[in-house]
Structures are given as C-alpha cells and as structure tokens.
Amino acid sequence: MPIYFSKKILLGFTTGLCLQICTLSANANSTFTVRSLGLQKCEQLVGAMQGETESQAVVLYSQWMAGYLTAKNASLGVLDVFPIRDPLGEWVRFVTLVCAGNMNKTLAEVLEGSVSALADYRETDASAETLELVDGEHKIRVYKNYLIRMQQHLNGRGFKVDSIGRFDESTKRAFLEYKKSNNIVGPALPDSLFLVFVLSQGKTQ
C-alpha cells in the first residue's frame, strides 16, 4: 500500500514536538514491547509524540526507529538512507510527520514506504562529505549531496542561491523565504519538515 506525503499535515506541527532521541533504559513493566512497535498504528505514535512531556513510549519509539535505520543501512549496503546525519531526532520527526498523514497504517509500513520514497537521497559513498548547517540556536549535519540537491530545488522555484554546495547567506535566506511562502515552521534549514514538504511535491530537480 502506498504512503502519502501531505503538505497540510505540516501546518499542524511545530518544532516543539517531543522528539528527542534518548538513551534511557526501558522499564521492564512497560505495556510496550520492542517487538510489537512496528505493528503499532501511526495514530499511536503521533499521539505519543504530541505529548507535552517525554514519555516512556517516546523513548521506546525513538530507540526502535533508530535501530531500524541502522539495520536498514546495513541490509541495503549504503552509508545512509536518510540524508540528515544529525541529530538523529530529525529521523524520528520525519517518520512522525509521515505517520501523521497515514494514521491507519502501521509504523512498519510507513518506515518501509519512507525508505522507498527516500531512494534518490541515499548516500552510498562511505567517504561522503557532511556539512554542519547552523541557523541561530538550531543546527543539523547533512550530507553535502543533499544540500546541493535542496539548493537546486530552491533555484528551480525562483529562490536564488549563489553558491551551490556552500551554506552561505544566500542559501539561508532562500530557505527562510521558501519556508515562509509555504507556511513551514522552523529555522532556515533543510530539516525534516522541509524534506517532507519537498517529497509531497514529487520529484525534485
């Protein structure tokens, strides 16, 4: 079954979602079990992530999705299927956003569909260069190829970027203007919200 990348879903989310990757141990008395998380419906994941405080469910979901990403990279023989290297919470946020548009599907279905949708963004070069992108207090580390692709996407939609492959002021300004024009919240970075929006539009340049 196909999954959907919804533009409208982004309007209901903010960067304040409780999506930290945690290293806490799971409580042995939890009603959640790691084996069953993939069978949980997306509505359960989204509900947990929209909580005001970090819960044990959030910890387990985050750890499970982190493990899934590591295993998928290994099984496909690629460096990374997700173009945002750090923080890992961006991967969790990405999956949660996709789940929000596919509430009746299982987490496993959405993860598999997301990996397929991200096929063009996979990094296969073990020595691929990464760049730290900073906007105020916000920062992410991405693969350079991903930044280039997103800069080309911006240029193709009339948001001028001067230096392809560098995160200069023209790039930051273009990301900010693009997000504002499309009602996407968050810093002037190609973060998970930006990526979901781009995927919702189909193929990029």
Task: Label each region the model flagged.
Residues M1-S6:
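N-terminal secretory signal peptides that target proteins for export/translocation
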Residues K8-I9, I21, K180:
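Hydrophobic alpha-helical segments, especially transmembrane helices
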Residues G12-C22:
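Bacterial N-terminal signal peptides
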